[in-house]
Amino acid sequence: MPEILINKPVEDELVESYLLYSMSVIVGRAIPDVRDGLKPVQRRILYGMYELGLKHNSPTKKSARIVGEVMGKYHPHGDAPVYDALVRMAQPFTMRYPLIEGQGNFGSIDRDPPAAMRYTEARLTRLAEEMLEDIEKNTVNMIDNFDGTLKEPEVLPSKVPNLIINGASGIAVGMATNIPPHNLSETVDALIYLIDHPEATVEELMQFIKGPDFPTGAVVVNASELKKVYEEGRGRIIVRGKVHVEDGKRVKRIVITEIPYGVSKAGLIEQIAKIAKDDESLPIRNIRDESDKRGMRIVIEIPKDANEEVIINNLYKRTALQDYFNVQMLVIDKHKRPRLMNLKGLMEAFLEHRFEVIRRRARYEYEQYTRRAHVVEGLLKAARAIGVVVDIVRNSKDVESARQSLMETLEITEEQAKAILDMRLSRLTSLEIENLQNEYSDLVRKISEVKEILEKDEKVKEIMKKEFLYLKQQYGDPRRTEVTDQSIEYNEEELIVEEDVVITLSHKGYLKSTPLNSYRSQKRGGKGITVSKLSEDDEVEFVVVAKNTSSTLFITNLGRAYVLKNYQLETTGRNTRGRHITAFLNLEDTEKIVALASLNGEGRDLVIATKSGKIKRTALKEFENATSNRGVRAIKIEPGDEIVSARVVNSEKETLIVATKMGMAIRFPVSDVRRMGRNAAGVQAIKLQPGDEVVSVDVIPPGEEGEILTVTEKGFGKRTPVQLYRIQRRGGTGLRNISDVNKTGYVVAVRYVRGDEEIVVVTRNGMMIRFPVSEIGVIGRVTKGVKLIELGDDTISKVAVVKD
């Protein structure tokens, strides 16, 4: 074989060859034709099945037979892509309106593969037959197949708006298409409206087409964005699975009955199982797939008291239960060019195609009716002169002379004469002649009708509307996908499963949050467990037990207040030290935390106590502008003084108890402390003895129920009835609260309790013990208490009370 040399720069050849290859993939493989909504392989499969006679009411044939027919005659590629395309057109979870009826295993929504083609069988659906109707009437151009031995349709006549109702997807070279499916009934209504109102806008068409209608149902949640998507032909559609909650005797069940289009059910279950395993804060107990022939049903069991909305939001955010359909309405137009069209453009192109198909069908029928009418007219002439015809035939030497004689005698054409000679004698009975006359009249009427179609555009439009209404009547069904507007952006709080956490801050500024259930409840007098892995020269300085959905107020030595959402703290294990406070709060170099207060969304005022005995009450709304990045002034600090405690109060009927390290305590009404601005210094709460200082303040609700819990640094503690602390005037010396601080050590904290709480005690070396408050005995006011924790050389630094 002689060599062929091309004298051309290789880069030029690469550009041209790759461009040809790209266009071949775009036009001949991956992008659908706007007229029938099919890619070449799909069109060839449907036409091949039509040629095999595989109609909806005929027996099915082996898929291998169909694939072989298509490959051998029209599609000279591998059998796998042909079979894959055939399978997809038969899957009810892939096609909104399947074009092939499959028999056997054609895969599943779990993405199980179909059976081999030698095992499965198929035939066309009725809807697919509607797409092929009239193809034999010269309604579309027929082109050569790959080897020029056969003809195949360039496009199908397609009475059905397949591209719109079934959508399409494909990846070509440098471009891709992704068109969502829609409801046939809605599409028909929109097409009819567009026929009557050619200037209609996309917004007007959307009165009928509400949005995509996926075969798997689900819910489109960004309805307000659909107008832009349909106007531009591109955009994002957000789809969520359909979920409801069922109440059981011991558990609640989150039930998923529909999933987003294109999502694997098995894959979704795996995703849910993974986050249930990896994220212990999500209380998912069990996941079951109860799907059957009646429909999909994925059951997620959660505790009776769990917040199902938070769990569902997490599933939307972290799994394919919420998915995105990225619309790109790229199609091949009738000039074989790739074009991005909007919704109206797709509909106009389809209507233009149907207009041309109906005209071509009318032209074909006009020719057929005219030819037949011409022949029947000749037969009627012969019937009226039957004697002459018989004489001519009997006296003619051969067929040719008989034809010539008939043409001359009856003044008919050669075609008519041939039909007369081919006519059987039985056609000359009076009944047959009457039938010919009726046929001729019918043909004249039909010719008039098709001529009107050829001459009047309005007649074509009328036919289109009738055909569309027929489709709606035969194949229309209710919408499956709900279209609505829902909140699709979550704030972080909507994803947080509420739980109690222990927030600790060390002397060196290491802040951490640990689930309270990490610390098992122990007996009073135990050794405790590690709360934080700190260095030898560091110690736990503050501890707060709160909900992870609430906030914590941090007050600094400069009198500034910062607010941090508790869920912003990374939840860690017990044996970690956490992250430095500066990673969360924008503190100045000389600024350090001196008090913490839990903000649970309730409360009216913040009470701040200082070491020197000052107390101040400020409305919480004064701190609304405080964030983790920007603090606000909370109190004016006098030189040598510092903040020791802060609490939230709800009512002026409550009372405050202020305690000192040397065992004194004073109780007075909240109303004794008037509200002040953030820049005020406060008023005197208690008159201190030399060397004494305030260590704690707490709030006592109205009434005389409950006890005052006192804990000292050497591990002693006691509960004393509230009524033993009589209400006094603010500013006095108070009452003796502990009998012998030399033995018990200085007082660390004083808290109001009811007896049904738990106490969390943290030592300077980072040990923690948690046990019920009820294990601490109720004794008198001037006593030393009982031993709460074995400390050794350690001492207690902070105390927190866990309330139900």
Curated annotation (Swiss-Prot):
Its main location: cytoplasm. Gene3D superfamilies: 3.30.1360.40, DNA gyrase/topoisomerase IV, subunit A, C-terminal, Topoisomerase II, domain 5, Topoisomerase, domain 3. It is an enzyme of class 5 (isomerase). One of its GO terms (biological process) is DNA topological change. It is found in: Cytoplasm. One of its GO terms (cellular component) is DNA topoisomerase type II (double strand cut, ATP-hydrolyzing) complex. InterPro entries: GyrA, GyrA/parC_rep, Gyrase/topoIV_suA_C, Topo_IIA-like_dom_sf, Topo_IIA_A/C_ab, Topo_IIA_A_a_sf, Topo_IIA_dom_A, Type_II_DNA_Topoisomerases. Residues 31-495 form the Topo IIA-type catalytic domain. A motif (GyrA-box) lies at residues 522-528. Keywords: ATP-binding, Cytoplasm, DNA-binding, Isomerase, Nucleotide-binding, Topoisomerase. It catalyses: ATP-dependent breakage, passage and rejoining of double-stranded DNA. Heterotetramer, composed of two GyrA and two GyrB chains. In the heterotetramer, GyrA contains the active site tyrosine that forms a transient covalent intermediate with DNA, while GyrB binds cofactors and catalyzes ATP hydrolysis. Few gyrases are as efficient as E.coli at forming negative supercoils. Not all organisms have 2 type II topoisomerases; in organisms with a single type II topoisomerase this enzyme also has to decatenate newly replicated chromosomes. This is DNA gyrase subunit A. It comes from Thermotoga maritima (strain ATCC 43589 / DSM 3109 / JCM 10099 / NBRC 100826 / MSB8).
